[in-house]
Amino acid sequence: VSDGGATALEATADPATGDDADAAGHAARRARFLREQLPDWIFVVAAVATVPLVLFVFGKDQWFLRDEWFVIAGPDGLQLFEPNAGSHWIAVPRLIYAVLWRVFGITTYWPYQLSNVLLHVLAIVMLRVIIRRSGVSNWLATAAAAPLLLFGPGSQAIVFGFQVGFTGSLAWGLAQLVLADTEGGFKRRDLLALGCGLLAITSSGIGVTTSIMVGIALLLRRNWRMAALHSIPLLGIYAIWARVEHASSGSQVGRPSAMELIRWDRDTIAATFAELAHIGVLGWLIVALLVVGVALAIGPWRDKPWDEIRRQWAMPVAMFVSIFIFASMTGMGRWFSGEAGARSSRYLYLQAVLLMPVVAMCAQEVARRWARLTPVLVVALVLPFPFNLSAFDDDIGLGKSFVEQRKYILTTAVR
């Protein structure tokens, strides 16, 4: 009887137990979706939507300007080793423009823009990958990276087709860093990483900064041999090219003094913080977040072994240091343009991208200890986004009317 009674009790208990298990499984899947998959999908949708938004909304009035004509009007468009503006190696942009010129001519601008927009999206995708690999949660990684997809203060690097060199160097440099982020000795992906590094240095002078950045990151994350392998050959190739082609990063008005260079660095980095935050108090909150996050990570409140800290912070620290390297290298040639030059849209864009991993890491340190602050941190990171959209300026250059007039003349006068 007891066996029969036990069997009967089990028979009546099993359905309830099964229902409880199903409910628990459903709750776990829902929690996982909200915690991991939803922020991933939000970022994917935002990245895909960026392309048509730039081409047909924010950059719809952009047309050929300045340096583009030097490339298009060249003898054959393939002077692959000739410096642009006296200092940049732009072999990759020259190739892209040569192909597009032969296919589309100057009857439409969007194919030229598309090349740059795709590289811009690649750069921000690589940025989010780096942030995630550094140990930042999905929500904070998305909140840090997604607003940069339509970063109005950096609009020049997004809507201007010829920034395929500037933005391209950043994208290829970040791709090199992601590919080189592996364990052990030399692998096939290291070869692919070096290929990305070569594309970076042959897209613009920004490739020099990204090569140094990758070297610093791998020195902290892997070993000195891999760091040297991923930086010294690329820097050597660039140095040889600069020597042979007589490229110079200086200006015609001479070199800046130490104080002038410091002033440039101060102005351009301060402008980056200001434009990222948009609202003054948020800028100071970002600074406070950096201080608190670093203190929690390496100060008396440290709760991880140093080796783990070194590996997690390697890429964000390398990118943060690269801000100062880039600012100083740019200041050497552009210092005479003063604060207005230091606040150039494309500089703010690159520096914002390089800054964001450290900001995200510091936010993660706070959220890891006080989980209830995570939604607050997410909101703080995305709050400037709608305000920064207004910084997109269709009148890049000499104004919309000038662009329309130039476009009309050049596309009809030869008929």
Model-identified regions with their sequence ranges:
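Membrane-interface alpha helices of multi-pass inner-membrane proteins
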Residues: R189-G205, T210-L218
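Short hydrophobic alpha-helices at membrane interfaces in multi-pass membrane enzymes
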Residues: V178-A200, R225-H230
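Transmembrane-helix signature of polytopic, membrane-embedded enzymes
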Residues: L127-F151, L170-A171
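Transmembrane-helix motifs of polytopic, lipid-linked glycan transferases
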Residues: L114-S137, A175-L179, V292-G299
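Membrane-lumen/periplasm interface segments of multi-pass, membrane-embedded glycan/lipid transferases
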Residues: T7, L65-P111, S231, A239-R302, ...
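Membrane-embedded, lumen/periplasm-facing catalytic core of multi-pass transferases
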Residues: A342-R346, T374-R415
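Perimembrane helix-loop-helix junctions
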Residues: G4-G5, T209-A239
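Signature aromatic-anchored transmembrane alpha helix within multi-pass, membrane-resident enzymes
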Residues: S231-L235, P316, Q364-S390
